[in-house]
Amino acid sequence: MPTPETAFEPQHNFNPEIIKAKNIKKITFEIIDKKDYEVAVDKNLIEIYEFNTDGLLSRYYFTSIVKTFERQVVSKNRKGRTLVKTFNDYVYDTVSTSYFYSGNNLILKRYHDGMNYYESRYYRYDSLNQLTKELRYKETNNSPDRSVFILGNQVLLSEDSFQYKKFSSGQLKCTLLNNENRSYKEKITNFDSLGRKINVNEIYTSAAWIMQENKYEYSGKKFVAAQFEGNANNKVILRNTYEYDEKDELYSEKQFKNETLVKEISYVTDKNDSLLNSIIIRDPANKTIRIVRLRYDTGAVSKSDR
């Protein structure tokens, strides 16, 4: 489910209401990569999303290949000729992020690189549920079991505060301050008559020449496009477009960079329960296809095991 807040995030976004209503506890993304004119290779890559009882994401983790080893298998055919086949074996790391909430507000996000590095972000909110402070720490885990976290040492990496000023029903200004209480960035968000974001402008106080703008487009109730434009290094324009079927289910997404198509994504939905079944990601420049199959685990039976 694309939203203005997550349009350019690499991580998938889910609708908590649907997750809760269907009692989904976990979604596993099984990933296969394929190059054009080559056989698909299953490297056992996965992404897993776990949810709490409110349908909110509680943990996200994925496997990444850190080493590849070639293995040769020697055999003989029926005529006695020696055949040598080469296979790849992989060594994996599991990278994870855990999420903790107070009500629907995210109050802690903890990243773990799979080894010994932990980085956490703590969030505080005002009475209007607006984010007022973000503290980022490097942390250590005192537990010998990596699946259990016991807080050891904390080193503060950054501390940001957020102050808000509402100019009208359609505009909100947010000033970002560092740990010395000095302003370093301003964000001005404009909303339409339905309260939806239509653009966000960012200006850096200490480098006023750096400007960033996000624009959002809608068709009826549907979110159909997001565009980012920035000039921090070289000028870059990112644009995502979304298409929906007759049931208002997302079925196509295109991602552009400086008007060049970089990804074309197809979403296949199960007609019986309207759950996403698979994702096909086409990279035209590298001539590759990523095929993602989704497996759902509910409070009862895994959908793929039915």
Which positions does each model-derived feature cover?
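Buried hydrophobic residues that stabilize the cores of well-folded domains
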Residues: 1-306
